[in-house]
Amino acid sequence: MLGSVTDFLKPRLVDIEQLSPTHAKVTLEPLERGFGHTLGNALRRILLSSMPGCAVAEVEIDGVLHEYSSKEGVQEDILEILLNLKGIAVKLEGKDEVILSLTKSGAGPVTAGDIIHGDDVVIVNPEHVICHLTGANAEISMRLRVQRGRGYVPASARLHTDDEDRPIGRLLLDAAFSPVVRIAYNVEAARVEQRTDLDKLVIDMETNGTLDPEEAIRRAATILAEQLDAFVDLRDVSVPEKKEDKPEFDPILLRPVDDLELTVRSANCLKAEAIHYIGDLVQRTEVELLKTPNLGKKSLTEIKDVLASRGLSLGMRLENWPPASLADN
């Protein structure tokens, strides 16, 4: 009797209904009451957010400087073209990033099949329309950066400080790396012998064709199992506290006096007294500075005000100044 109360039913994969190459229904039963929603919601979230895939992440279109423009001879504006580029289903074999090119002229549609690529790239939906050329002399040329990633990554999340040097005309796209286009689940009633309070989980999902739906669910289940492994054997694992290396001096003290943007007269007076760094300056007193040739009360007031705006003052004591990095210089 005790075993029947504490033992959980183990679900089995009942059916995989392949509705199309990109659309499938997977049925799993029997599940203990409530486990249909528990597992269904977990798998749904993983399938939407954690499936790896490839997507167009950046594009450079000849004659286009920014996304809020249009191109002569092209029916769509640039924003619509960028939106269409996000719909290209692409797979990379053995690479994490490639640069592809597309050049098309003459009236008619421009499709994903017009993209020039090697054997290590597969365009799953070559019929996907990118834009339309409206005249015999119309032409469009672009370079596409395809990257491997996971989930959905907006363009703003991929901006870095070093992107200030990015050439004008390179447009970042919101990258939808996940191959899962749609995922829904339904929990139905199931029965085993006399028990009628069980769950049946039906997962209905579509992909963009770069990943088989059955394989997608298998990967999602593997990810979920790996994440739960840590809970199987809970132990008191103490994580050593990481000691942060605090700088010996405030970084502002290591900056040159020129960064204070003093007047030329004041700056020259300080340099004449070998005061090259802000740390050198804050250790001087008002009396010492007034003894500096050509440095009067007006210059002293200027220096005090500039230091105060940065939370500093004259007459500060700095132990072990100057640091070795400045002494070597």
Swiss-Prot record:
It catalyses: RNA(n) + a ribonucleoside 5'-triphosphate = RNA(n+1) + diphosphate. It is an enzyme of class 2 (transferase). GO terms for molecular function: DNA binding; DNA-directed RNA polymerase activity; protein dimerization activity. Its EC number is 2.7.7.6. Residues 1-235 are annotated as: Alpha N-terminal domain (alpha-NTD). Keywords: DNA-directed RNA polymerase, Nucleotidyltransferase, Transcription, Transferase. Gene3D superfamilies: 5' to 3' exonuclease, C-terminal subdomain, DNA-directed RNA polymerase, insert domain, RNA polymerase, RBP11-like subunit. One of its GO terms (biological process) is DNA-templated transcription. GO terms for cellular component: cytoplasm; DNA-directed RNA polymerase complex. Residues 249-329 are annotated as: Alpha C-terminal domain (alpha-CTD). The keyword Transferase applies. The keyword Transferase applies. Belongs to the RNA polymerase alpha chain family. DNA-dependent RNA polymerase catalyzes the transcription of DNA into RNA using the four ribonucleoside triphosphates as substrates. The N-terminal domain is essential for RNAP assembly and basal transcription, whereas the C-terminal domain is involved in interaction with transcriptional regulators and with upstream promoter elements. Homodimer. The RNAP catalytic core consists of 2 alpha, 1 beta, 1 beta' and 1 omega subunit. When a sigma factor is associated with the core the holoenzyme is formed, which can initiate transcription. NCBIfam families: PRK05182.1-2, PRK05182.2-5, rpoA. This is DNA-directed RNA polymerase subunit alpha. It comes from Tolumonas auensis (strain DSM 9187 / NBRC 110442 / TA 4).
